[in-house]
Amino acid sequence: MQSNLSQQKENTTTVKEKTVQIQVEQSSYDVVIIGAGAAGLSAALGLVKSEEYKALKSQGKQPKILVICKLQALRSHTGSAEGGIAASLGNIEKDCWQWHYYDTVHGGDWLSDQDAAKMLAKEARDTVIELEHFGVAFSRTEDGHINQRFFGGHTADFGQQPIRRAAYAADRIGHQILYSLWQKCIEENIKIEEDIYVTDLAINHKSNSVEGIIALNEKSGKVEKICARNVLIATGGAGRLF
């Protein structure tokens, strides 16, 4: 018994804790947008044309906007969309935003944010026209209008019959939208950083507010703290952050 105890004592090794210091690079922006798909790029462009942004510019100030993505920007999953973008243009048959609104809420099993669904349906027409101005090459009717086709869940008269509502660009609508938004962001000198993997939000627990993000720069291998007055999460559905 004693020999076993002494043997165990001899085999015991003391492990000392070692503190590893990680160098964290820090930068600061007015707005950081996480995600460079259609939502993130659209948000950046929306900020640029906002009255607040223009007012700051008129005062000689340059608001700093940063869009970050974990891959190359044009590899966003937005580019995989094929069917079309819903908008009550009425180019093929009579349509209205109220029908589009109903279909959106109904398609979401009545769980959707109905205020957001109403805004989406009402503004879809102007959004499609704006995308056309950005350079999206929509498929056309013989008389030159944006073409539309049937797509699942699009109905007339509040669910009574199918309707052609999806504006499309052959089978590459997502690709067209993504590239056009990206090009517009480049024209507006919006900064886009690639290969940045967000690991956490920087939270001030005293004020219970978000002050930026913590991220891993996969190119340099360094951890970065990016401070921001505003953080917008536009990461799509895959991460399930919704």
Question: How should each PLM-predicted stretch be described?
Answer:
Residues 3-12, 18-23, 63-64, 69-219, ...:
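Conserved N-terminal/central alpha/beta ligand/cofactor-binding core
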Residues 12-13, 55:
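Ala/Thr-enriched low-complexity intrinsically disordered regions
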Residues 26-29, 220-230:
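Core beta-strand elements of the Rossmann-like FAD/NAD(P) dinucleotide-binding domain
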Residues 33, 214, 231:
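Mobile, glycine-rich extracellular loop/lid and propeptide segments
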